């Protein structure tokens, strides 16, 4: 396992390697709510054995303010408060939506990421940019907010298509 801290308008701990088992040590005490997409939940059910994640639909077409609103409504329904930690488990779309929701829900709640794609590890999860699409324009609504940590567990890349691996290497 390799770990480093990244300082850009705040501090994020980035952990790289086979590290999902380290996650309990990284999570804060208190309530954690997980956000993922249906593909990740289906392909990696072992990641969600001890929780009831909020599942969004996969795909760029769901990276919208409507999805943000739906997630915020679900957080309200679950009684999430300012101390609730939001954990995004997925690729760049999930981490973008998670970071955006965490920044606007109750004017900001703490959050972190478990990136399940190589592209997500090298781009979306460590850039501090969290945006959603608006009226067909990519990332037109967004915020700059650093997660408390980013877990990049390389074993999670095993289910990725070669096209996704190439996209991550190119980034």
Regions found by a protein language model. Name each.
Residues 84-103:
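Glycine/serine-rich anion-binding loops at beta->alpha junctions
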């Amino acid at each position: 396992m390799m770990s480093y801290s990244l300082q850009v308008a705040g501090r994020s701990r980035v952990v790289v390697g086979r590290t999902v088992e380290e996650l309990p040590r990284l999570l804060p005490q208190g309530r954690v709510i997980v956000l993922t997409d249906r593909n990740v939940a289906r392909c990696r059910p072992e990641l969600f054995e001890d929780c009831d994640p909020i599942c969004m639909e996969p795909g760029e077409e769901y990276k919208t303010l409507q999805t943000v609103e739906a997630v915020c409504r679900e957080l309200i329904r679950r009684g999430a408060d300012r101390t609730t930690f939001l954990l995004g488990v997925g690729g760049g779309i999930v981490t973008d939506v998670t970071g955006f929701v965490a920044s606007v829900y109750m004017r900001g709640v703490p959050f972190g990421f478990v990136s399940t794609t190589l592209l997500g590890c090298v781009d979306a999860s460590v850039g501090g940019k969290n945006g959603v699409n608006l009226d067909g324009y990519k990332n037109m609504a967004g915020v700059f907010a650093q997660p408390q940590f980013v877990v990049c567990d390389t074993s999670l890349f095993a289910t990725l298509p070669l096209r996704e691996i190439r996209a991550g290497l190119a980034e």
